[in-house]
Amino acid sequence: LLSTDIDTIVNVGASIEGCRKTLNLAKQYKNIYAAIGVHPDDYDKLNEDIISWLKEEALSNPKVVAIGEIGLDYYYDEPERAVQLKWFERQLQMAVEVNKPVIIHSREACADTINILKNGNADRIGGIIHCYSYTKESVKTFYDMNFYFGIGGVLTFKNARKLVEAAEVIPMERILLETDCPYLAPVPNRGKRNDSSNIRYVIEKLAEIKKCTPEEIVRAT
């Protein structure tokens, strides 16, 4: 990656073990920073001891720049929604306490995500709606809570009409290009392992949507 134009990486934890690996990478490489948090897929392994550990790392480690990936995933409804709501709220509370922005995973859970963010004072810290997948009508709600919109390879897919419509109305200064490595590689590499070198394809598609040059996208994002 260092042979490309990528010079700084925020590696995002999702599982407890993933957070440990992310912290080790951030310690090993000066250009890698860490986001730590537990994804809804792993909420059944979460407890207050883990929350305390995450909080201590966020407070004491200057290379921890965000809390995430946290949120809700109702696509499979596992674990059950009550469990997801509990640990999303708890991790958001912790993020506000340590004053770190959040990286939000939200899949088919727009209303509950918005309610928790509003009730949890997420506007104080802001963050990113990772892999934004909701409508253009929801953009203003997240925007008003100081969130950025993560856009990656999905933007290049043929069935991405809803995301294209949202991208049209998201202000350029609130778009954050992301990889979601190793998933969701953009066309023409869809189905292959994704990495940050593929961001150029997202840039090209976004420039087409925004009717500007790729260079303008790079400068803005």
Where are these regions (language model features)?
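Mid-domain alpha/beta scaffold segments of enzyme catalytic cores
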Residues: 1-221
